[in-house]
A protein has these predicted regions:
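A shared catalytic/ligand-binding motif for oxyanion handling
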Residues: 1-232
Length: 232
């Protein structure tokens, strides 16, 4: 089963829609998790129909401040037996019945980007961990690094936020599944001495999923952070 996790940074422009459409044709994902869509429910519903998804849950963007920010969506094909459990502006949690006797859990997670609010991401992740015990893969963008070697650039990364992230992953028994492809998944687009690039961690899984997700493959691309993975 192929799945796609993409921080699209607004789906309102045709370039982003074209990239997503091309990925659909190339990778044929059964599940898609989108972050920072900056779209409302009706706009994502149209996209869902255009891409021939039958199921979907949309968390609309926030327009309370006069612009658009945030917005999540999880879309899935008709043969995927997916059941939404909970959702918020920072997550969509679901159970998939691939095998009725052995369901597994997938969570699309989008961490708070603001440094002053990142502790809320870890409170949410701990809460999700406490809700149930089963094979679990958590995809998305945590907006944090695990170590300083996941960043290159002139601005040094503070240690304490990375430690807080490592601590919450340990508490939730979530392990980084690694990747194939380029090491860095984001850059600030600035020239020369101001250039910064980072590897924002991809999917993680619980210990219970170590055998269930054996053979999972990852491709991480630098262009508009996206992660494509296959559950074998």
């Amino acid at each position: 089963m192929n799945a796609l996790s993409w921080n699209c940074r607004r789906l309102g422009n045709q370039r982003a829609v074209n990239v997503l459409s091309n990925l659909m044709g190339e990778k044929k994902p059964k599940i898609v998790f989108l972050m920072e869509t900056k779209q409302m429910v009706d706009e994502i519903r149209k996209l869902k129909e255009d891409l021939h998804f039958t199921g979907g849950l949309v968390v609309p963007c926030d327009r309370s401040w006069g612009g658009r920010r945030g917005g999540l969506a999880m879309l899935w094909k008709d043969k995927v037996d997916l059941h939404i459990q909970t959702y918020s502006p920072h997550h969509i949690d679901a159970i998939i019945q691939t095998n009725p006797r052995n369901p597994w859990r997938i969570t699309g997670f989008y961490g708070y980007p603001e440094e002053s609010h990142k502790h809320k991401s870890w409170i949410l992740l701990r809460h999700l961990h406490s809700r149930m015990s089963m094979s679990w893969v958590c995809i998305g963008d945590y907006n944090e690094l695990l170590s300083s070697d996941e960043k290159q650039g002139r601005i040094e990364k503070a240690f304490s936020p990375m430690l807080a992230f490592r601590n919450v992953l340990a508490h939730c028994e979530l392990a980084d599944l690694g990747f194939q492809g380029g090491k860095f998944t984001w850059n600030n687009g600035k020239p020369s001495m101001d250039f910064v690039q980072e590897r924002l961690i991809g999917p993680v899984q619980t210990k219970l999923g170590e055998t269930y997700f054996r053979g999972v493959k990852f491709v991480i691309s630098l262009l508009l952070t996206r992660t494509i993975f296959q559950l074998c």
